[in-house]
């Protein structure tokens, strides 16, 4: 297992396991230290292609945030890159911009899975689904971190030997 250094105060590592009850692993995770992203998606069991939904959601999230990071841009709701202020490292990584980027990226990931369901003609009771949870850390400011989650995957913090649950299940 590889350990990734995200910033001066954050390290991350990850693994998935099929567990004892399922025959197929429907989890996907990503650690991208360049853009400060740590994310996990857990495909919804009992529906079609949860493993595809989790993989595609993670990829869509990473692509969106990497594009924003590389261009120094925040996408608007109509997907056109737009600059909200002059391009500076500290300005682009402000908490306000992290919130905007993260919300837009999660919506983009959801739209990707929704579109795939529509393209496959899957009815709502069988459509692909996934949870999505993670953190994005501003590379220039270790105190600017945004957590996001949809579904019942949980986010925990380990600090001083104590584990604390940071999210409530969204089902």
Protein language model features and the residues they cover:
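PP2C/PPM-type serine/threonine phosphatase catalytic domain
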Residues: 1-171
């Amino acid at each position: 297992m590889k350990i990734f250094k995200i910033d001066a105060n954050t390290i991350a590592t990850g693994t998935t396991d099929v567990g004892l009850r399922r025959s197929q692993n429907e989890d996907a995770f990503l650690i991208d230290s360049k853009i400060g992203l740590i994310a996990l998606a857990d495909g919804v069991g009992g529906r079609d292609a949860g493993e595809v939904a989790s993989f595609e959601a993670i990829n869509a999230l990473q692509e969106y945030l990497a594009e924003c990071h590389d261009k120094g841009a925040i996408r608007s709701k109509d997907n056109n890159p737009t600059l909200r202020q002059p391009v500076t490292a500290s300005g682009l990584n402000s908490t306000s911009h992290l919130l905007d980027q993260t919300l837009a990226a999660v919506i983009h990931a959801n739209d990707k899975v929704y579109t795939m369901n529509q393209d496959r003609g899957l009815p709502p009771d069988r459509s692909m689904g996934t949870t999505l949870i993670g953190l994005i850390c501003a590379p220039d400011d270790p105190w600017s971190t945004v957590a996001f989650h949809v579904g019942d995957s949980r986010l925990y913090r380990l600090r001083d030997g104590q584990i604390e649950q940071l999210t409530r299940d969204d089902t």
